[in-house]
Amino acid sequence: MGNIFKPIPKADYQIVETVPQSLTAINSTNLSTYECFKRLIDLAKKEIYIATFCCNLSTNPEGTDILNRLIDVSSKVSVYILVDESSPHKDYEKIKSSHISYIKVDIGVLNNESVGNLLGNFWVVDKLHFYIGSASLMGNALTTIKNMGIYSENNSLAMDLYFRSLDYKIISKKKCLFFTRMATKYHFFKNHNGIFFSDSPEHMVGRKRTFDLDCVIHYIDAAKSTIDLAIVSLLPTKRTKDSIVYWPIIKDALIRAVLERGVKLRVLLGFWKKTDVISKASIKSLNELGVDHIDISTKVFRFPVNSKVDDINNSKMMIIDGRYAHVMTANLDGSHFNHHAFVSFNCMDQQFTKKIAEVFERDWISPYAKEIDMSQI
């Protein structure tokens, strides 16, 4: 009789980055986002699912090339692009004459306030290969916006992202939401060799999936020595159409870790000209707390002065004790966790966590990471 408890086949993971040419001091040997997307298209034999906020690839040669490749391959395999209901139709004129299924998803139908956006970014090819990360389906995500994600081939974990894609398709119909499966094979209590996905908002978690906020708080509360955090915003607020509510859950957990357990906290803020004023105030208050024996360091990642208004370090990650890594696509913001749809990558494999930590460390010591100047943020 065969062994019914077969070990899960181990899969390989690669870090994927967009490192803009303007960041000349950063030397990355990781797979580029542009090459990753081309590779996924080339691998496709049956179907491609892409979930992203918007499709705006035709802004530069690299983005146009990816769009043309998707259009070409759509005559041979099924291609689904799932975008947020509110996203602009930038590439739709080219897409509508192709075989691509272009689907608008209204996450707001899931709650009484009709609030919510599709913020996650992932690709699933043939239920075997995937990308998940901060790079959206925009031309500048391949060139001038600094992004980070994860790529894997021949990985059964891809099926879990496929399940998310099907859920978004059902939501797009705005009917029969009861049939949204919210399925997953792997989660916090049953991971795939140390890897699993977590989800937001909470009403898309179901019985088996893991709520992303629960993961974030669990990792912070478990921290014994270090927390390294690369973010675009840290907002202790939850916003609706008509109000703003104080939401200190994550910030309080960080402060407790530092004050009560002596954890060293480093925060790298992806700063740009559109940074939220409340996020600025939140980061400033953390920086002010780093006195005496309280080990808090905060830096802002700034592009060179001649950069464009939308140039930003959009890489989002959290590394705990060098043992756990959480790669995010959304911000640490109550509104994101409560209303918006996204999927995060969780890693308990120490070898791959080390590789993610090396990206944070490289960025932290780079000349673009500046100590916070209170007069400039």
Swiss-Prot record:
Membrane topology: Lipid-anchor
Covalent lipid sites (N-myristoyl glycine): 2
Gene Ontology annotations for the cellular component aspect, listed alphabetically: host cell endoplasmic reticulum membrane; membrane; viral envelope; virion membrane
Domain of life: Viruses
Molecular function, one GO term: catalytic activity
The keyword Transcription regulation belongs to this UniProt entry's keyword annotation: no
PLD phosphodiesterase domain sequence ranges: 309-336
Major localization listed first in the record, in broad terms: virion
Intracellular or extracellular location(s): Virion membrane; Host endoplasmic reticulum membrane
Keyword list, A-Z: Host endoplasmic reticulum, Host membrane, Late protein, Lipoprotein, Membrane, Myristate, Viral envelope protein, Virion
Protein role: Envelope protein associated with the inner side of the enveloped virion (EV) membrane.
PANTHER family from the UniProt entry: GM01519P-RELATED (PTHR10185:SF17), PHOSPHOLIPASE D - RELATED (PTHR10185)
Protein name per UniProt: Envelope protein F13 homolog
